Amino acid sequence: MKVLVLNCGSSSVKYQVFDMKDEKVLAKGLAERIGLDGSRIVYQRGVESKKVFEIPLPTHKKAIEEIFRLLVDKNDGILSSLNEIDAVGHRVVHGGDKFIESVLVNDEVYNTFKGILDLAPLHNPYNLQGVDACLELMPGVPQVLVFDTSFHQTMPEEAYIYALPYEWYEKYKIRRYGFHGTSHYYVSRRVAELIGRPVEELKIISCHLGNGASITAIKNGKSIDTSMGYTPLEGLVMGTRCGDIDPAIPILLMEKENLSPKQIDEILNKKSGILGISGVSSDFRDVGEAAEKGNKRAELALKVFAYRVKKYIGAYHAILGGLDVLVFTAGVGERGPLERSLICSGLEHLGIKLDPEKNKVKGEELKISTPDSKVEVWVIPTNEELMIARETVRVVGKK
């Protein structure tokens, strides 16, 4: 069975084609700068070198058409025709409480999803454009929606209800949803596989640390709490997002700086976090280099980031009633020895001890805790695309 996985962003489309017989990636790449000058498609067949094609891409549909053309190209392609694609899996950011698991697209699902686009206005509309393009270009091929939020639908009420007037929850469905669910789901299953224990027996804290970052408490294989909230703005300090702050601060700043709701939203989402504190960059590598050169604000930014993660680890250790495994994943989690060290330093009383030598690992699966560490600490590169492909196979198999 061959599965195409699509992840449509505001100006990009990431794609991968899997042969699910052995979960091998046949081709992958990225269409970027959609609707802008300098648009292009990066294409890689198997493990061959990447090729870059400069192509005008005015719309997401055009980008997907060009991706399909490359997939069946007689020189570069991997398919004799698009009919070889058995199903398409779409990454969708927000399913609200309407979708508690991955679903096959039909008229009812399509219309329900269309009704919750405003839950993630920067993401869901573009996810839908990907679905629309595939329905038009590949009629009859099953389309599956895989939601970032669905893994967290197992949270208990006390974890997801905000202390606001309850009628706001009833009227607007304002509650914690959480994100990066596909990543947290994948690494929790993968680490259980690597240590040879059923995931249902483990207490896991999963740290997805990238430009966007979240942390999840996983008990008996299920998410019981997560740091992101109604939107991806809540929780950890991120590349450009503030994470947890006193809710009165935006109101105060709107008055003092004469800012509109849109302007304050822009500041909290795109000008805060590591970038806001350091004044250097939203890229942790740049901030790390600046800190090494003595930039005090860059150093402070990394300390604030690590401190917040550490607080969440402590909180989740408490609600889990102990901890078996701590997992680091995503860009910083996988490739940030400094950040991992800052986070784990001082957590020895919780049974977390890093091996300094093993902690130098970047981008590989490895247990980085010491032999006498009560908690196993792992680096697990995330693979959301593979998880989406697996979910697609599972859902289509139910049909």
UniProtKB/Swiss-Prot annotation:
Q: Which cofactor does it need?
A: Mg(2+); Mn(2+)
Quote the record's cofactor note: Mg(2+). Can also accept Mn(2+).
Q: Write down the chemical reaction(s) this protein catalyses.
A: acetate + ATP = acetyl phosphate + ADP
- Residues bound to Mg(2+) are N7, E384
Under the heading CDD domains, the entry gives: ASKHA_NBD_AcK_PK
Q: Which GO terms describe its biological process?
A: acetate metabolic process; acetyl-CoA biosynthetic process
Q: Active site located where?
A: D148 (proton donor/acceptor)
Could you tell me which InterPro entries the record lists for this protein?
Answer: Ac/propionate_kinase (IPR004372), Aliphatic_acid_kin_short-chain (IPR000890), Aliphatic_acid_kinase_CS (IPR023865), ATPase_NBD (IPR043129)
Q: May I ask which residue range the UniProt record assigns to the signal sequence?
A: none
Annotated residues that bind substrate are located at: R91
The catalytic activity of this protein is classed by the Enzyme Commission as 2.7.2.1
Site annotation (Transition state stabilizer): which residues?
Answer: H180, R241
Q: Where in the cell is it found?
A: Cytoplasm
User: Binding residues for ATP, per the UniProt record?
Assistant: K14, H208, L209, G210, N211, G212, D283, F284, R285
Signal in keyword set: no
GO terms of molecular function:
acetate kinase activity; ATP binding; magnesium ion binding
Instruction: Summarize the protein's role.
Output: Catalyzes the formation of acetyl phosphate from acetate and ATP. Can also catalyze the reverse reaction.
Entry's family note: Belongs to the acetokinase family.
Subunit structure, as described in the record: Homodimer.
Q: Write down what this protein is called.
A: Acetate kinase
What is the primary gene name for this protein? ackA
